[in-house]
């Protein structure tokens, strides 16, 4: 099921939230989508998405005139699909328990911001600093590295310059890569 806004008009109204949003979560393998065509370049479009009880908006800022179809469901899965194998409790502890599917119909790249309620944060995720939060893309056959910036108070994550689309999730950004030293020379100096 897809609902389409053909003229790129921003969604009007106010007070979007848990009780007022576009519900794209459906049962089984079916996935609901909300499509917005003719989105102007560099205009931020907030799409008031959710699952019927939780508000999970998506903000897209396209680089060029674009069209996107978006949907969201709760219950993150191994393959980013609504009927996929659920993450184990251990894996869910470090992520937001939701999947945002963003498909580009036309255009090039965009910046994206994903929002979520604290109730979807895993126990470990809730302890992450802002610098440790990013957006991960389903890279088939696995979830890719989480990159971008986050805010664990406002419960948002942003990823810039996205040009490959499909399912996205929110998790921990990678650690600094370890360095292997082949040679290290140190000396005592300055009285220390």
Predicted regions and their residues:
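Functionally constrained cores in energy, signaling, and assembly domains
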Residues: 134-136, 154-155, 183
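Residue-level detector of functionally pivotal "anchor" positions at catalytic/ligand-binding pockets or at interdomain
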Residues: 169-190
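Short, flexible loop/turn segments at beta-strand junctions in immunoglobulin-like
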Residues: 159-161
């Amino acid at each position: 099921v897809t609902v389409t806004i053909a003229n790129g008009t921003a969604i009007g109204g106010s007070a979007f939230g848990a009780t007022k949003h576009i519900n794209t979560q459906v049962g089984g393998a079916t996935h609901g989508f909300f499509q917005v065509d003719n989105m102007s370049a560099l205009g931020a479009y907030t799409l008031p998405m959710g699952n019927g009880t939780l508000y999970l908006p998506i903000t897209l800022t396209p680089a060029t005139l674009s069209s996107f179809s978006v949907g969201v469901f709760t219950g993150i899965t191994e393959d980013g699909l609504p009927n996929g194998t659920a993450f184990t409790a251990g894996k869910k502890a470090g992520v937001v328990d939701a999947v945002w599917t963003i498909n580009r119909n036309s255009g090039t790249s965009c910046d994206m911001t994903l929002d979520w309620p604290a109730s979807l944060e895993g126990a470990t995720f809730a302890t992450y600093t802002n610098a440790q939060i990013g957006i991960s893309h389903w890279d088939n056959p696995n979830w890719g590295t989480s990159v971008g910036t986050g805010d664990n108070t406002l419960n948002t994550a942003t990823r810039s310059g996205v040009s490959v689309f499909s399912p996205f999730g929110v998790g921990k950004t990678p650690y600094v890569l370890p360095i292997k030293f082949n040679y290290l020379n140190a000396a005592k100096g300055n009285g220390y």
